[in-house]
Amino acid sequence: MSDLLDDEFYEEEFENDLLDASEFEDEFDEDAEIDDDGFTVERKRRRAHSVSYRVVSVRDLRASLNEKINQLTSIIDLTREQVLGLYRYFKWNRERLLERYIDAPEESLQKAGVGLSGSKQREVVHHEGTCEICYDEGCLPFFSAECDHEFCLACYRQYLDSRISEGESVIQCPEESCTQIVSIQSITKVLDEKSLDRYHRLLDRSFVDDNDHLRWCPAPDCEFAIECHVTQASLSSVVPTVTCNCGKQFCFGCGHDNHQPTICPLVKIWLQKCQDDSETANWIHANTKECPKCSTTIEKNGGCNHMTCKKCKYEFCWVCLGPWTEHGNNWYTCNRYEEKSSTSARDSQSKSRASLERYLHYYNRFANHEQSAKLDHELYEHTHKRMTQMQVDSNLSWVEVQFLKNAVDILFQCRQTLKWTYAFAYYLARNNQTEIFEDNQRDLELAVENLSELCERPCQDCSLSVFKQRVLDKTVYVRSRRDVLLDDTARGLAEGRWEYVVDV
């Protein structure tokens, strides 16, 4: 990236290093074409719950960036620095850039901080003067960007280093009132090699961060990005799950781990609810009741059944929830369970408790599959040892015992899917579509438990070949049940069949 704006760098041809990471999907190659961002995109027939995406390397990102700048400089008479500044200001939206620039070229350049021509080469010069930052005087090395605001070289370098350390890739002139962006050529003249390398990595990141169709893989130390053209507006009808070359699977829309079949808006609501409710929900359910008048949660801290709500001062009976005025002097016993006022209060509380019990039903199953998925991760180590032992006990090669690891892989995927089916089901309105969804959910859950049990128990009751065939058959079946559930849910999202109890 150090030669980002050199002509030779722009003209250099890169091999197509785009790698397909959709190894978990059944797909068929068709003709390839070039998209608007310069990436090679292969059109494929995919499952209903899959989306088109590409994994791109830093090398490809830089090639695409250079190509975009080259294309625009051939249309409008600007330097590469100015085109780069415009692109970054308009978030790499070519159409919006051209529209605004054609309508108001000078204003667009000024807002982008590249209004001044960058054709003049900036050099460090020595002369008598005073630095306006440190106020050193004498014959000093001075430097200025395209705006000609001059400061001593040491201060300029320190200023750039501090901005880069703060993660900034668009750096304005040190002059307080100046909006001019310091060009890449100018920064190259001032910084040492180590600082320049950090700056160029920031440029790479900004290209992805500012582009709606690109997202960095969230895996630690992974340098791949994902290119996907699913828009934010469509996230209520599609779950754009992608898989990086490093193996990380995540949602392109929100960046969370794969949460199919639940759409991103529901994921956000569910996670917030879990954070707010789950830690205390069980305790509340067991130890508290709600005021029949204002519904404030109340904990009983003594033996007396005469309760007074601290919030609204309403007096009621802890046992039957009726007004205390109807209880006379029977402070520690209650025989008025069938009174109309008590029944009404209990009905109100019953609805509230039913809502809490419904939430706990879905949350407990959500949490159970999350815990099971973590245990399946531990199963990998056990599986590796078991695969090694299989080779010792038979004449199978390492490739031939991969069926066991593949089974654990699909188990983990299905646990993740099942976990999120409960979040999705919690927000579904009850109708025929919900019944079908729960049938598919039940079938997948049963298939997963059968495969999990088979993988964990020793194969003492049958030969290795029979055991292998059983695992292969159940793995295929589990994968097919997952596809059925996800495909049906995805089609329902696309067709608008799902109805929710919350607004999304």
UniProtKB/Swiss-Prot annotation:
Keyword Zinc-finger: yes
Binding site for Zn(2+) 3: C217, C222, C244, C246
Single biological process term from Gene Ontology: ubiquitin-dependent protein catabolic process
Subcellular location: Cytoplasm; Nucleus
Chain residue ranges for the region called TRIAD supradomain: 127-338
The enzyme's E.C. designation: 2.3.2.31
Binding-site positions, Zn(2+) 5: C291, C294, C309, C312
Catalytic activity of the protein: [E2 ubiquitin-conjugating enzyme]-S-ubiquitinyl-L-cysteine + [acceptor protein]-L-lysine = [E2 ubiquitin-conjugating enzyme]-L-cysteine + [acceptor protein]-N(6)-ubiquitinyl-L-lysine
One GO MF term: ubiquitin conjugating enzyme binding
Domain notes: Members of the RBR family are atypical E3 ligases. They interact with the E2 conjugating enzyme UBE2L3 and function like HECT-type E3 enzymes: they bind E2s via the first RING domain, but require an obligate trans-thiolation step during the ubiquitin transfer, requiring a conserved cysteine residue in the second RING domain.
Protein name: E3 ubiquitin-protein ligase dbl4
Native species: Schizosaccharomyces pombe (strain 972 / ATCC 24843)
Taxonomic lineage of the native organism: Eukaryota, Fungi, Dikarya, Ascomycota, Taphrinomycotina
